[in-house]
Regions:
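Nucleotidyltransferase catalytic core that binds NTPs
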Residues: 1-207, 298
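Histidine-centered active-site/metal-ligand motif
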Residues: 14-17, 43, 226, 255, ...
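Residues at secondary-structure transition points
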Residues: 49-54, 78-82, 221, 225, ...
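Charged phosphate-binding loop/patch that engages nucleotide di/tri-phosphates or the phosphate backbone
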Residues: 179-208, 369-397
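Internal alpha/beta core interface subdomains
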Residues: 361, 365-369
Length: 397
């Protein structure tokens, strides 16, 4: 069997990665490509990375419809730095009778002799080099010849030139230039948006403290205790579902920031700032606290992340097709530790960590049952959301 290992951080994986793997499969008559997702590589700044689980998820999404391509997770679960020679020593022991190859970019080849124990790698695998557009082929061929003189094993060029797009460009420009998204599998693009990866906004513990103090001044004591419960539950759910935890906590802290103002003020804020008010919201102005909270999030508390604002806006009614943060805040608001009157809370609290969509649906189901007993309070958005997640549970969405 002829197998090839394609190593990298894949932060994120993009279409040229898949194209290179496909070109190598065809050119060298390979049987299998394994994307070896790096854990803690010695040459990367870990501050630039995202949760390992997110990188793994994106690789799985990118390759799930690609025949002959699979994933190797050994480095993700290894403690300490991820040195390639360790992985290739293991792989060779696992496949003693197989021909093993290693795909690397042309930039990596130029420094291969400076890697830790490159001679071990070359003893275990032949090196396949992926050139990029703009490479000086004379320099690249000289580097290949030098490596051949220094190490055992073969070094060969893949007959494919990658466009030279670096993953760092996607990370930096994802929200600024939609053209870079054309280099991504649509499922990977959707995952990045849903998990708020590479966001220009980041938060730290100082932001948590600042906004917590603001809420302590703005809210009644019982509402503030509830807010802390939602924030900590959102943090926990974010860790479970691979969403930036501090971002989720900020959304939890601010979700009720307009809860303790008067109905008259909520209506006035909406009318002054052209925030649409539906008939039922005029009838029950407390329903506006999400919309007003989303406005205050930016105008009063200097939090400009659109995902946070949207999660605050829909945290009471939900909406069809909620993103991940929407669901985290919607659920956290319902199941936080201070809640004790809703039905089947123990089941919901468990379900939130097993299947978030299922938990959302169960909450909507209980909410609709309550509203059916109080039909004058029915909000059409809640009904639309319930119907959407009912279809989702049936596999029709």
């Amino acid at each position: 069997m002829r197998i090839v290992i394609y190593g990298g951080t894949f932060n994120p994986i993009h279409n040229p990665h898949i194209d290179i793997a496909g070109a190598a499969l065809k050119q060298f008559s390979l049987d299998k490509v394994y994307f070896l997702v790096a854990g803690n590589p010695p040459h990367k700044d870990t501050a630039e990375t995202i949760p390992d689980a997110c990188r793994l998820d994106m690789v799985k999404l990118a390759i799930e419809d690609e025949p002959g391509i699979d994933i190797d997770v050994r480095e993700i679960y290894r403690t300490g730095k991820s040195y390639s020679y360790i992985s290739f020593t293991e792989i060779k022991k696992e496949h003693p009778e197989d021909d093993i190859f290693f795909i690397m970019g042309s930039d990596s080849l130029l420094y291969f002799k400076n890697w830790v124990k490159p001679e071990v790698i070359s003893q275990c695998a032949d090196i396949l080099v992926a050139p990029r557009f703009g490479d000086d082929m004379a320099v690249l061929n000289d580097a290949i010849n030098e490596c051949k003189s220094l190490f055992t094993g073969d070094f060969a060029l893949i007959d494919y030139k990658a466009n030279g797009l670096a993953s760092s460009v996607i990370r930096n420009d994802f929200y600024k230039d939609e053209n870079v998204r054309n280099w991504l599998n649509p499922k990977v693009e959707e995952y990045i948006i849903d998990h708020n990866l590479y966001s220009p906004y980041s938060y730290d513990y100082e932001d948590i403290l600042r906004l917590s103090q603001e809420m302590k001044k703005e809210l009644k004591s019982s509402r503030y205790v509830h807010t802390l419960g939602v924030a900590t539950t959102a943090y926990s759910l974010a860790l479970k579902w691979n969403y930036p935890a501090y971002t989720a906590m900020i959304a939890g802290i601010l979700h009720d920031c307009a809860k303790c103002i008067s109905d008259e003020k909520r209506i006035a804020v909406c009318e002054k700032n052209n925030i649409p008010i539906r008939d039922i919201e005029y009838q029950y102005p407390h329903l506006l606290h999400g919309k007003v909270g989303a406005y205050y999030c930016k105008s009063k508390y200097d939090v400009f992340d659109e995902q946070i604002a949207h999660a605050i806006a829909v945290h009471t009614t939900g909406c069809p097709g909620m993103n991940l943060l929407d669901k985290i805040i919607f659920v956290a608001d319902y199941i936080e530790p201070g809640r004790d009157k809703q039905p089947r809370l123990d089941i919901l609290r468990s379900e939130a960590y097993r299947d978030l969509d299922s938990c959302v649906f169960m909450i909507l189901e209980d909410t609709v049952n309550y509203l059916n007993e109080n039909p004058e309070m029915v909000d059409s958005t809640t009904i639309d959301t319930y119907n959407y997640y009912l279809d989702k549970m049936k596999g029709e969405v």
